[in-house]
C-alpha cells in the first residue's frame, strides 16, 4: 500500500485529492487532530487516531491538540477539572497506539496576542449564522448558545496555522469548520489546509454514538464489559449501517492483519480473514452468524485495547 492509499483508506472525503498528492511529495509535512478533553477515549476517537497513525506511517509529523481551552469555552468544567482530564486523555491516546506524536495543550498556544488577534480578525469575516451552523454540524445544536461557543469554530480555524500544520484530520462532522479554514485562512496570509475526513460510525445500538447512552466501547471497559456489550450489540443481517462491521472496518483491520472467527466444528469450524472486504463478503453471504461475528469483535477489541485498559487501571489505582 503506497502513501496515498494509506492516507485515503477508510475516509469519507479528501479536500482536495490533488493537494494531498502534492503534499505527500514534500519532505516535511505536518497533520493535526484536536480532541476536546471529555470523558473516556472510545471507539469514536479511535477512528481518527487510526488515521493519524496511517499518516505517520505515510511520512507525516503528527500533532495532537488537547483542546482544553475549547472545552472550557464549551462549558465542560473548570480549568482545573479539564486539565486533569487532558493529562489523562493524552496518556490514553498514546496507550491506544499513537506513538511519537507531538502533543500540544491548547492554553499553551491559544492565549498569545497573535493568536487572539487572528481570532478577532476572523470574527469580523464569519457570520454568526455560519458559525452556528458549523457547531450544529459537530453535534452541538444549541437553541441559546453562549458567545464563547460561537468563538469555538473560529479558534479551530486559527489552530491550523498556529500549529504550523499542512493538513487537518477530523470526522466528516468537522467539514463545515474545515471549509471555514480553507476559505478564510488565505485572508490572513496562510495556505488552506488539506482536509481528511473520516466517517461517523454508529454506536453499538445502531444509533448515534454517545457515551451518555452507553452505546460505546471505551478504553476503561474491562474484557468482561466488552464481551457483555458485544452480546447486546445490534448486528443486523445487512452490512449497511451495521455497527459491528463498522468496528471491524474502521477500528480493527487498520491495526490487525488477521481476524479469527472461533466456531465449534459442528457449526463449520474456525474461519480466518485477512481483509475487511473478505469479512464483509462472508457475512453478507450468510457464512457467519451474527453472534459469532460479535464474539470475534469482542476478542479483537480486547486485544486492541489491552495496553490502554492496563494504563486506565494503573491510573485509577
From Swiss-Prot:
SUPFAM superfamilies named among the record's database cross-references: Nucleotidylyl transferase
Pfam families documented for this protein: tRNA-synt_1b
InterPro entries named in the record: aa-tRNA-synth_I_CS, aa-tRNA-synth_Ic, Rossmann-like_a/b/a_fold, Tyr-tRNA-ligase, Tyr-tRNA-ligase_3, Tyr-tRNA-ligase_arc/euk-type, Tyr-tRNA_synthase
Assigned EC number: 6.1.1.1
Keyword Endoplasmic reticulum annotated: no
Motif segment ('KMSKS' region): 208-212
A single BP term in Gene Ontology: tyrosyl-tRNA aminoacylation
Example of a GO cellular component annotation carried by this entry: cytoplasm
Keyword hit for Metal-binding: no
Residues that coordinate or bind L-tyrosine: 32, 152, 156, 159, 174
Enzyme class of the recorded protein, top EC level: ligase
Binding-site positions, ATP: 211
Extent of motif 'HIGH' region: 37-45
Catalysed reactions, semicolon-separated: tRNA(Tyr) + L-tyrosine + ATP = L-tyrosyl-tRNA(Tyr) + AMP + diphosphate + H(+)
Assembly and interaction partners: Homodimer.
Protein role: Catalyzes the attachment of tyrosine to tRNA(Tyr) in a two-step reaction: tyrosine is first activated by ATP to form Tyr-AMP and then transferred to the acceptor end of tRNA(Tyr).
Entry-linked PANTHER family: TYROSINE--TRNA LIGASE, CYTOPLASMIC, TYROSINE-TRNA LIGASE
The protein's name in its UniProt record: Tyrosine--tRNA ligase
